[in-house]
């Protein structure tokens, strides 16, 4: 299948399922099953419930998708560590 045939949609992760699968609610209100792309797994990009993502879907099966981008928001920065106490 050529890359031009894929449909790109945006959505929000509703639920994190076992085996690195996700349930995503698209902007048009439809819920689909999705998995993280190999590049996201390779770079250990963590996807949590509530994250805004972009996914690719095949026009032949609109119930499954591949997450290929996690959008940054105000809460996705690195966790702040408490200050170190020196003696």
Swiss-Prot record:
GO terms for molecular function: ribosome binding; rRNA binding; translation initiation factor activity. The keyword rRNA-binding applies. It is found in: Cytoplasm. One of its GO terms (cellular component) is cytosol. Residues 66-87 are annotated as: Disordered. InterPro entries: NA-bd_OB-fold, RNA-binding_domain_S1_IF1, S1_domain, TIF_IF1. Residues 1-72 form the S1-like domain. CDD domains: S1_IF1 (cd04451). Disulfide bonds: none annotated. It comes from the Bacteria. Keywords: Cytoplasm, Initiation factor, Protein biosynthesis, RNA-binding, rRNA-binding. One of the essential components for the initiation of protein synthesis. Stabilizes the binding of IF-2 and IF-3 on the 30S subunit to which N-formylmethionyl-tRNA(fMet) subsequently binds. Helps modulate mRNA selection, yielding the 30S pre-initiation complex (PIC). Upon addition of the 50S ribosomal subunit IF-1, IF-2 and IF-3 are released leaving the mature 70S translation initiation complex. Component of the 30S ribosomal translation pre-initiation complex which assembles on the 30S ribosome in the order IF-2 and IF-3, IF-1 and N-formylmethionyl-tRNA(fMet); mRNA recruitment can occur at any time during PIC assembly. Belongs to the IF-1 family. NCBIfam families: infA (TIGR00008). This is Translation initiation factor IF-1 1. It comes from Bordetella pertussis (strain Tohama I / ATCC BAA-589 / NCTC 13251). The gene is infA1.
